[in-house]
A protein has these predicted regions:
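Charge-dense, helix-prone N-terminal extensions
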Residues: 1-78
Length: 78
């Protein structure tokens, strides 16, 4: 069973994925597969990376960058 939680409500893993990132993960199966293989620490780091954008445009750019890295199999997102 896939343990990756993408959606609304309480995440059983304690990780709340930003809506924009979750939407991209749903549309990008390879990125979602990589995200599912990431450790909890790596997932938290990726989410912090996305959320640390100072503007909405910066957050969108960070989401695109994170998705591209995950599509390439990278789990250390920066």
């Amino acid at each position: 069973m896939n343990k990756t939680f993408i959606g609304m409500g309480h995440s059983p893993d304690g990780i709340d994925i930003p809506l924009g990132l979750s939407m991209e993960l749903v549309m990008r199966p390879q990125a979602a597969a990589t995200f599912g293989q990431m450790s909890s620490t790596e997932k938290h780091a990726a989410i912090r990376y996305v959320q640390s954008g100072s503007t909405g445009e910066e957050a969108k750019r960070r989401i695109r960058n994170a998705i591209q890295q995950m599509e390439n199999g990278h789990t250390a997102i920066s």
